[in-house]
Regions:
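Outer-membrane beta-barrel "beta-signal"
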Residues: 65-67, 529-530, 535-539, 559-571
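Outer-membrane beta-barrel translocator/receptor signature
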Residues: 81-84, 91-140, 153-159
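Residues that define the transmembrane beta-barrel architecture of outer-membrane proteins
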Residues: 94-96, 108-110, 153-157, 200-206, ...
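Transmembrane beta-strands of outer-membrane beta-barrel pores
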Residues: 104-106, 132-136, 167-169, 178-184, ...
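Residues on the lipid-exposed face of transmembrane beta-strands in outer-membrane beta-barrel proteins
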Residues: 114-118, 159-165, 208-214, 251-257, ...
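Repeated loop/turn-to-beta-strand initiation elements of outer-membrane beta-barrel proteins
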Residues: 123-126, 169-173, 217-223, 259-268, ...
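Flexible loop and strand-edge segments within Gram-negative outer membrane beta-barrel domains
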Residues: 135-139, 146-158, 172-221, 227-248
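Outer-membrane beta-barrel domain signature, especially the mid-to-C-terminal portions
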Residues: 359-375, 405-429, 457-484, 502-531, ...
Length: 571
């Protein structure tokens, strides 16, 4: 079987080629990625910039890019803990060879980075970066329990070496990276014995990734990538259990060809994911872990007119794990300009949520060790909206959507048969609809403001993994109503002031078969950045200024008011 698997991998490598995704991190290392700009506006601000005006007499095709809004399904982890990049400064790599950054604050929060370019020619680029993020402070539980506090500890160290070569008509990228992450499971066990006795879990992850894509039009345009990950952990479900590890291989390919002239394309995308887990002898027969293989094909046609774009395609997903499955779902998008600055869009998509070990670690590192979450399937997801730009620098987006997912997972604190410090996945069928609006304003150039309001509606059925079913099934740990506000004010050419606010309510969890309503997230943050000179920048940021008490997951409290400050030195 393994010989066949490796033969399949080799065949996919030769078939898919390599894809340039410009030094992107893996899903796991995104937890550590630094935002190279100190720009506290909404993360999706790029997607809501004002649409270009069609000018005469030059005929220019309007910008009708598909509006695939990626709204979060759970409260952002970064609002609870100071994450790398929260107060990072702009690194003008074109002028400087490298940088050193260090921030520190209460709760022993530390955020550091070092980066250097070894080579930066027109055709070859080599650079290296090292990131550090850690915390080691006491936090209070929000439940009535003794002891009522615990030390939350984590330390992530990430290093990456990148190489890029620019050919005449294509670009090739390759990088290697290593992540060493250690942390404790600080969840509330309500006085029960801690399974890992507060020892540090450790994840080690090695990643090698290469990619290639054409930069000039070709008879057949190509874009491909290949990625290999090796990961291992230190502890299983107890101190004496065998630990978890394995290999993950990902390959992607996009081939398309112009037809009927213009920007019309016919193409096919392919994707392969293979996760091969090490055998764990200490698991019971009903806990055996299956390898995961998924092969996806997405044939599509892309059509464009003067003021519209349309993509018609389908997702064909073949999944092989403990049982073999075939799924088909739509992949259709349409957008059109209805006036000089306004547009409408509609998308109908679907697909498979892989939920590999690395996917789940990115969502929450506190998942029960040696646990694999079953893949989910979305037969269809529909979203649409209107983007209205009445004034230059002012934009309103109204949106809504509806989605059905089979085997959606909900992470809750393990409470049966007794409380433990881990999160476990419950699986159920989820219907999720939402409506909302975004406003982005930069009418007065020194001030940029982005506001998003969203209301979610959930319906849950066929939940698996419950020992005792509550009177009502909830979409556990998914917010009902959200408000996200970010503002940046450039007081001078050297001083920037920022303000951020995130609110989420109607959050639920479950413990001992009883629904538990979580406290609202009511997080206000403020910060400032000052450029002392071209080489030195200092910054200060405060999170959770209201010192609100709430759980990220039931039994996993967030830090109270926390302040970080530091500097960036560019050389």
């Amino acid at each position: 079987m393994k010989k066949n698997i490796f033969a399949l991998i080799i065949g996919l490598i030769s078939t898919f080629g390599l894809h340039a995704q410009a030094l992107q991190d893996t899903v796991l290392t995104r937890q550590l990625e630094l935002q190279r700009e100190f720009n506290p506006t909404l993360q999706d601000a790029n997607k809501i910039n004002s649409l270009p005006v069609v000018r005469e007499p030059q005929v220019t095709k309007a910008n009708t890019d598909y509006a695939m809004w990626t709204t979060r399904a759970t409260p952002p982890f970064e609002i609870a803990l100071p994450r790398p990049g929260s107060i990072m400064t702009d690194i003008p790599y074109t002028l400087q060879r490298g940088y050193v950054k260090l921030n520190a604050g209460n709760y022993a929060n530390i955020d550091g980075a070092v980066g250097i370019k070894f080579l930066d020619s027109e055709t070859n680029k080599v650079n290296f970066m090292f990131l550090h993020n850690s915390s080691n402070g006491n936090i209070d539980y929000n439940q009535d329990v003794t002891p009522n506090k615990i030390k939350m500890k984590y330390m992530d160290n990430f290093a990456r070496l990148n190489f890029k070569h620019i050919f005449e008509a294509s670009e090739f990228d390759i990088y290697g990276s290593f992540l060493h992450s250690q942390f404790n499971y600080f969840g509330n066990n309500f006085g029960e014995t801690r399974m890992l006795d507060d020892n540090h879990q450790i994840l080690s992850l090695f990643n090698l990734k290469a990619s290639l894509h054409n930069t000039q039009p070709q008879p057949i345009n190509y874009s491909g990538t290949f990625s290999y990950n090796y990961f291992s952990t230190k502890y299983g479900k107890t101190i004496t259990d065998e630990s978890f590890g394995g290999n993950q291989v990902d390959a992607k390919l996009d081939l398309n060809k112009s037809f009927i002239g213009g920007d019309n394309l016919v193409g096919i995308k392919g994707e392969f994911t293979g996760v091969f887990y090490d055998e764990i002898k200490t698991l019971g027969e009903d806990e055996k872990i299956s390898n995961f293989i998924m092969v996806d094909a997405n044939p599509y046609i892309h059509l464009e007119g003067f003021n519209w774009k349309m993509r018609v395609g389908a997702n064909l997903d073949f999944v092989f794990d403990d049982e073999n499955k075939f799924y088909i779902s739509p992949n259709v998008s349409f957008s059109t300009m209805v006036s000089e600055n306004s547009s409408l869009y509609l998308n109908a998509t679907g697909g498979v949520g892989k939920n590999t070990y690395l996917d789940m670690y990115r969502e929450s590192r506190y998942l029960l060790p040696n646990t694999i979450v079953k893949h989910s399937h979305t037969p269809f997801a529909i979203d649409g909206g209107a983007k209205i730009g009445a004034l230059n620098g002012f934009r309103i987006d109204v949106f809504g959507g509806y989605k059905k997912t089979k085997d959606e997972h909900f992470l809750v604190l393990q409470s049966q048969p007794q409380y433990q410090e881990f999160l476990i996945p419950l699986l159920g069928d989820l219907t999720h609809s939402h409506i909302g609006a975004r406003v982005h304003s930069n009418i007065w150039s020194p001030l940029e403001v982005a506001v998003e309001v969203k209301k979610n509606f959930y319906s849950v059925s066929k939940v698996k993994g419950l020992d005792a079913e509550p009177s009502e099934l909830k979409a556990w740990n998914k917010p009902g109503f959200e408000v996200d506000i970010d503002a940046t004010f450039s007081a001078t050419d050297k001083l920037k002031v920022m303000l951020g606010y995130y609110f989420a309510n109607e959050r639920w969890s479950i413990a001992k078969g009883i629904n538990q309503e979580l406290d609202d997230i009511n997080n206000l943050s403020a910060g400032a950045l000052y450029n002392v000179n071209k080489m030195v920048t200092i910054n200060l940021k405060a999170n959770n200024i209201f010192n609100q008490t709430y759980d990220m997951w039931y039994g996993y409290p967030a830090q109270g008011v926390n302040v970080m400050g530091g500097f960036t030195f560019k050389f």
